[in-house]
Amino acid sequence: MSRILDNEMMGDEELVERTLRPQYLREYIGQDKVKDQLQIFIEAAKMRDEALDHVLLFGPPGLGKTTMAFVIANELGVNLKQTSGPVIEKAGDLVAILNELEPGDVLFIDEIHRLPMSVEEVLYSAMEDFYIDIMIGAGEGSRSVHLELPPFTLIGATTRAGMLSNPLRARFGITGHMEYYAHADLTEIVERTADIFEMEITHEAASELALRSRGTPRIANRLLKRVRDFAQIMGNGVIDDIITDKALTMLDVDHEGLDYVDQKILRTMIEMYSGGPVGLGTLSVNIAEERETVEDMYEPYLIQKGFIMRTRSGRVATAKAYEHLGYEYSEK
């Protein structure tokens, strides 16, 4: 069974997110630094009648990178072609996509860090000079064909910016770091979602739900759906702070937004390794999770909330982790 706090997309959530997706920057809640910069770059590109410079959006899953790509296309008044790194298996796949673009269009590549190197190399000249050279045929009869491309904007999204090659990263003129959402912004998102789906929710309930949603809109919207079920069955249909606390407690989501896996990580560090330092590989084995899963899904939030510190020797549980789980902490 999937974690309810998993920030990767589940089931029918793609349809839900499309329904909730804002259309323009003025409707987009949060990520103010990224929005303010994009507003300037977009307006400048429109005034010059040029394609917007290529954009790299990076950050943990569920923070609105795909939504931002659609918003950028809407602000520019152009079409968006969407694909993902794992889907583009060979250079010919990329050429076919690029060939369909109209002047000024946006090409959005999700998980761009997963592009094969052979595909990435074709992308270099397309991004920099709007042309591609491809080989037609095989053996002695093969020949190089030069294709001019219309000016376009590539928007790449990644959860692992460190895995991008330097040549690819250098070709993005605009970068946007999507960060975990502030509590006030996430509360507003919960209230907006409830309004769109005609749910009755108090401000206190929206605030509590936002507090436990790990700074991630995708998780907040998922929890809202589950809390609505509790409100219908255990209450009068109104989502208030009492039913919200009861529902999230039953779902093993505590007041810091930690679930049983997060707590297992911290308890393992404290009980088995006296708080650390402990290596990521060792920790992963002890909690029966893949190293990459711990590093990408669990650790970022635990670090951001101050429960774990990274050191040269390994991960260390902080005094806050001890206090949160009811352990006595002593300085080493």
Curated annotation (Swiss-Prot):
Has 3 domains, the large (RuvB-L) and small ATPase (RuvB-S) domains and the C-terminal head (RuvB-H) domain. The head domain binds DNA, while the ATPase domains jointly bind ATP, ADP or are empty depending on the state of the subunit in the translocation cycle. During a single DNA translocation step the structure of each domain remains the same, but their relative positions change. Mg(2+) binds at T66. Its EC number is 3.6.4.-. This is Holliday junction branch migration complex subunit RuvB. Residues 182-252 are annotated as: Small ATPAse domain (RuvB-S). The RuvA-RuvB-RuvC complex processes Holliday junction (HJ) DNA during genetic recombination and DNA repair, while the RuvA-RuvB complex plays an important role in the rescue of blocked DNA replication forks via replication fork reversal (RFR). RuvA specifically binds to HJ cruciform DNA, conferring on it an open structure. The RuvB hexamer acts as an ATP-dependent pump, pulling dsDNA into and through the RuvAB complex. RuvB forms 2 homohexamers on either side of HJ DNA bound by 1 or 2 RuvA tetramers; 4 subunits per hexamer contact DNA at a time. It comes from the Bacteria. ATP binds at L20, R21, G62, K65, T66, T67, E128, D129, F130, R171, Y181, R218. NCBIfam families: PRK00080.1 (NF000868), ruvB (TIGR00635). Residues 255-332 are annotated as: Head domain (RuvB-H). Belongs to the RuvB family. One of its GO terms (molecular function) is ATP binding. Keywords: ATP-binding, Cytoplasm, DNA damage, DNA recombination, DNA repair, DNA-binding, Hydrolase, Nucleotide-binding.
